[in-house]
């Protein structure tokens, strides 16, 4: 007798259910997507005990006839595709015809459905077996109640996480699907209590204000872009806002919530230099592409998609994000350049000291005393335009700038580092960074491997205005440096050069020039701990205004923090 046998239908359904129904949220996903495909304008999702004991989805969609409802409980029974060609042009969320059969095979299910013109139907199913079929006198739409999930597959229950985890997954999914369809009203009920109801008025911004706290609302940039058959729109976080160590993305392709590395990498590259490595921005992104150019049939849960034109999608998303961030920074500087108040008189040092004594503020407030000049450009000092007032410097690193209704706190090192980075990058693009011969050459010790590396990249480093010569078997003598470092002491020059050696020692040399520019910018910028005079602070702020530079240092740290009068009044409960 042969060893190969056909598995019984009940066992086949349970195996198939393992791919489609991984956990309670899988049930919610499949049922809600069916409701959307049925044209529902209102969907109510209820669950209890993390979805293990109860999941119910009610909609006002087109409903099913008795014949269709019974047929839909069979695998591969669907109204959404009919031919192989349909598989490559899918416009619905569901299409395989597996969901209801898979869910019914591992639970106790009650299905009620009614169309506009025909009588309704009630079907009771246990473990994939139909137990009862009757008439149902309800409203147009569908009601599906799933209870005792995995009651007949106890091994599957063991792999479920805690009730709190399963609950959070369901809440997160309903939020995500509600964002994708703001024109549909969603109600979520957890353990008998309503969590939220969305209005279903199509207003996405209003929906975001309902689902997220005010911190999220105030930190988003809206954008939209169209190129040929591609369209992208949505919201991304402002540089320095809402960043996290894990991805916090809401990606939708043709209104389908997906995970996709192409989109994720394009967004991260768009934020490059505006966010720290290893961190993620907040994003809600709707990408529309021709249905024929996206394959949604690459994963059992349909969460992953594959693009026919991967490179074009990547470049389109990257450009869109970069342009949105550039535009936001332009707006920021335009708003800063046009305050609505007249310039205030600066207080003298003695007046500020008196104010400190009266208020007894616990701040290291050092107005306008200098230990190191910001730039030789201070000698060409031009006062700030009217409407701005530099309050002073705190903690030897932060400049406080005031306008009529806002306060700006500026990290002097990070801001100057960005300025130097942009200047050096521009000089390198023009093909010339000015160098200068130093009076006392700096001798540093190097290993044999480092000497080989320096010889290999000698031409590149000379483009950055460094020049050196051998000084024995294990030493080199630096004789020329960029003009920016003329007045640096030997230890500072050695530290910079060692950092550059570290840059060229890394295996990934694809972005070597950028790494070297970042190192040079960091070392040439005014340091944290340098006390600045007023003219130096004003010169730094003027350079920020004039260059319209990104609002982060080259490594992605924000250098400016805007606090509105409204924010302060809200904090002190004045509004």
UniProtKB/Swiss-Prot annotation:
Keywords noted in UniProt: DNA damage, DNA repair
Signal peptide: none
Sample GO molecular function, one term: mismatched DNA binding
GO cellular component: mismatch repair complex
Keyword check for Acetylation: no
Gene Ontology biological-process entries: mismatch repair
Gene3D superfamilies recorded: 3.30.230.10, Histidine kinase-like ATPase, C-terminal domain, MutL, C-terminal domain, dimerisation subdomain, MutL, C-terminal domain, regulatory subdomain
Keyword DNA damage: yes
SUPFAM superfamilies on file: ATPase domain of HSP90 chaperone/DNA topoisomerase II/histidine kinase (SSF55874), DNA mismatch repair protein MutL (SSF118116), Ribosomal protein S5 domain 2-like (SSF54211)
TM stretches of this protein: none
PANTHER family on file: DNA MISMATCH REPAIR PROTEIN MLH, PMS, MUTL (PTHR10073), DNA MISMATCH REPAIR PROTEIN MLH1 (PTHR10073:SF12)
Protein's name in the database: DNA mismatch repair protein MutL
């Amino acid at each position: 007798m042969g060893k190969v046998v056909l598995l019984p239908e009940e066992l086949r359904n349970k195996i198939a259910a393992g791919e489609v129904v991984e956990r309670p949220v899988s049930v919610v996903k499949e049922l809600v997507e069916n409701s959307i495909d049925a044209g529902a304008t209102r969907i109510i999702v209820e669950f209890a005990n993390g979805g293990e004991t109860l999941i119910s989805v009610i909609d006002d969609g087109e409903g099913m006839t008795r014949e269709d409802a019974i047929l839909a409980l069979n695998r591969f029974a669907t109204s959404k595709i009919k031919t192989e060609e349909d598989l490559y042009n899918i416009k619905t969320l569901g299409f395989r015809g597996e969901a209801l059969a898979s869910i019914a095979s591992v639970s106790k299910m009650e299905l009620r459905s009614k169309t506009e013109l025909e009588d309704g139907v009630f079907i009771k199913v246990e473990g994939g077996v139909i137990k009862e079929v009757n008439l149902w006198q309800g409203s147009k739409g569908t009601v599906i109640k799933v209870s005792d999930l995995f009651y007949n597959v106890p091994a599957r229950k063991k792999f479920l996480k805690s009730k709190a985890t399963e609950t959070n997954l369901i809440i997160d999914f309903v939020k995500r699907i509600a964002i994708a369809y703001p024109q549909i009203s969603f109600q979520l009920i957890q353990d008998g209590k309503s969590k939220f109801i969305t209005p279903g008025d199509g207003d996405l911004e209003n929906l975001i204000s309902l689902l997220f706290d005010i911190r999220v609302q105030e930190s988003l940039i809206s954008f939209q872009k169209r190129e040929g058959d591609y369209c992208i729109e949505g919201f991304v976080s402002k540089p320095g806002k809402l960043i996290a160590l894990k991805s916090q993305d809401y990606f939708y392709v043709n209104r389908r919530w997906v995970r996709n590395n192409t989109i994720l990498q394009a967004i991260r590259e768009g934020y490059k230099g505006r966010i720290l490595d290893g961190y993620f921005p907040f994003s809600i992104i709707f990408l529309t592409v021709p249905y024929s150019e996206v394959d949604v049939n690459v994963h059992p849960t349909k969460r992953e998609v594959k693009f026919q034109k991967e490179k074009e999608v990547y470049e389109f998303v990257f450009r869109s994000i970069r342009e949105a961030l550039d535009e936001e920074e332009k707006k920021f500087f335009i708003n800063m350049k046009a305050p609505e108040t007249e310039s205030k008189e600066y207080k003298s040092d003695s007046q500020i000291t008196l104010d400190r004594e009266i208020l007894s503020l616990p701040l290291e407030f050092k107005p306008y005393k200098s230990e190191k000049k910001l730039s030789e450009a201070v000698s060409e000092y031009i006062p700030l335009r009217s409407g701005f007032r530099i309050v002073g410097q705190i903690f030897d690193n932060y400049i406080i700038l005031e306008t009529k209704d806002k306060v700006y706190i500026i990290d002097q090192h990070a801001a100057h580092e960005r300025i130097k980075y942009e200047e050096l990058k521009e000089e390198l693009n023009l093909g010339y960074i000015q160098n200068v011969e130093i009076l006392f050459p700096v001798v540093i010790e190097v290993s044999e491997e480092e000497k080989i590396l320096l010889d290999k990249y000698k031409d590149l480093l000379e483009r950055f205005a460094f020049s050196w010569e051998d000084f024995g078997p294990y030493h080199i003598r630096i004789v020329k440096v960029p003009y920016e470092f003329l007045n640096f002491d030997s230890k500072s020059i050695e530290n910079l050069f060692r950092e550059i050696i570290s840059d060229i020692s890394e295996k990934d040399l694809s972005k070597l020039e950028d790494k070297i520019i970042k190192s040079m910018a960091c070392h040439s910028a005014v340091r944290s701990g340098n006390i600045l005079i007023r003219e130096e602070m004003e010169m730094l702020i003027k350079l920020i205004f004039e260059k319209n530079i990104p609002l982060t240092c080259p490594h992605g740290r924000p250098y400016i923090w805007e606090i509105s009068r409204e924010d302060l009044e809200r904090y002190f409960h004045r509004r």
